[in-house]
Regions:
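Enzymes that bind and transform nitrogen-containing heteroaromatic metabolites
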Residues: 1-176
Length: 176
C-alpha cells in the first residue's frame, strides 16, 4: 500500500521548506512506527531538512525525487526523477511531492497539532494538501498532550506551552 504521512497545524501548515514548526517526540515515534521497514519517498528539500546524523532514515530505503544530479548531497539515498513503482511505501514530503502523489496513495496518516501557525512563515509557508473527498476517516485518537513537545518557530524562543496533538488515519474509500 502506498501511503502519505505528515504533521500539520490546525491551519494546515507543515513547515517552511526548511523545518517543521514544532518538535513533538510522540509524533516522531509515530512516524518511525508507521514507516519503519518500508521505503520512504521524499523531495530534495525534505531530504536536506533531515538532520544529517539521521540521514538516510534507518531501517527504510530512502528515495529522493529530484532533477538534481546525485552527489555528495544525496549520499545514502537513491535519487529518482520520477515516482518509483512501489506497492508498499510512504510519501513523507514535502508539499509539492504530497500534491503530486496524492492521487496514488491509499492511506493518509496525519498528526494534527493543536496550534495555529498563522502568518509566522509568511510566503514561505508550506501547506498540507486538502484530504480528497474519496478518503474517509478510518481512525482518530482523542487529543493528547505532548510530554516534551514544543514549538520551534523562527525568530522566537521555543515555547514551553504544552502542545496538544491527535493522530488521524484516512483511507481511500475504494481501497478500504
Amino acid at each position: 500500500m502506498l501511503g502519505a504521512i505528515w504533521a500539520q497545524s490546525l491551519d494546515g501548515i507543515i513547515g517552511d521548506g526548511e523545518q517543521m514548526p514544532w518538535h513533538v517526540p510522540e509524533d516522531l515515534k509515530h512516524f518511525k512506527d508507521v514507516t519503519m521497514g518500508a521505503p520512504v519517498i521524499m523531495g530534495r528539500k525534505t531530504w536536506e531538512s533531515l538532520n544529517p546524523k539521521f540521514r538516510p532514515l534507518p531501517g527504510r530505503e530512502n528515495y529522493v525525487l529530484s532533477s538534481r544530479t546525485p552527489g555528495q548531497w544525496s549520499a545514502g539515498a537513491q535519487v529518482l526523477t520520477a515516482m518509483p513503482s512501489l506497492s508498499d511505501a510512504w510519501v513523507i514530503g514535502g508539499g509539492q511531492i504530497y500534491t503530486a502523489t496524492l492521487d496514488q496513495v491509499a492511506r493518509i496518516e496525519v498528526t494534527l497539532m493543536g496550534v495555529n501557525i498563522g502568518s509566522t512563515y509568511g510566503e514561505k509557508s508550506i501547506y498540507a494538501p486538502d484530504i480528497p473527498e474519496d478518503f474517509g476517516l478510518a481512525h482518530s485518537t482523542d487529543w493528547l498532550t505532548s510530554a516534551k513537545g514544543h514549538l520551534a518557530l523562527p525568530d522566537k524562543e521555543a515555547s514551553d506551552l504544552p502542545i496538544k496533538y491527535r493522530f488521524l488515519t484516512y483511507d481511500r474509500k475504494d481501497a478500504a
